[in-house]
């Protein structure tokens, strides 16, 4: 039973880490990366469709993204969606290709992005701590129902705490790595 609670907590904590990784990939660094456009959707035949399903997205010359839409009539909609996003990118179209030059990040923009990254990391830490709290309350419930002893409960809580410490350390590692990436000019 204790192992079930611990493995459930571990899988939930790993999902929190995966969510943090996804959030970190969306934060713009100085380099172009197709995942920058993952959050952009376009109205296509009455459904919101992700931009990465509407065409080929590739990196050109390190600081430029190119989009080659499958349906050329969507070019104006794609441009509008990019302009309305909070990425601060200005698309330029040449024929059937949309180019997105990424402007270099200013020092102020870098600091703002570091704040965003820190907030995402804090959200992940809070999520992990909430999972720890849930697991500990499950252990207390088992103790209350006399399914485990107090020693087993304490041992289970120690295991959950060790798992929590390990996951929070991973969050710190991801945060440190992203901050260094952002502050590198």
UniProtKB/Swiss-Prot annotation:
One Gene Ontology cellular component term attached to this UniProt record is:
cytosol
Q: Name one GO biological process term.
A: cytoplasmic translational termination
Q: Where in the cell is it found?
A: Cytoplasm
Q: In the record, what terms sit under GO molecular function?
A: ribosomal large subunit binding
Stored Pfam families: RRF (PF01765)
Give the primary localization class: cytoplasm
Record keywords, A-Z = Cytoplasm, Protein biosynthesis
Recorded superkingdom: Bacteria
UniProt key word Cytoplasm: yes
| UniProt cross-references to InterPro entries, sorted A to Z | Ribosome_recyc_fac, Ribosome_recyc_fac_dom, RRF_sf
| PANTHER family listed in its UniProt record | MITOCHONDRIAL RIBOSOME RECYCLING FACTOR PSEUDO 1 (PTHR20982:SF3), RIBOSOME RECYCLING FACTOR (PTHR20982)
Q: What does this protein do?
A: Responsible for the release of ribosomes from messenger RNA at the termination of protein biosynthesis. May increase the efficiency of translation by recycling ribosomes from one round of translation to another.
Family to which this protein belongs: Belongs to the RRF family.
This protein is called what?
A: Ribosome-recycling factor
- What is the source species? Alcanivorax borkumensis (strain ATCC 700651 / DSM 11573 / NCIMB 13689 / SK2)
- Gene name in the database record: frr
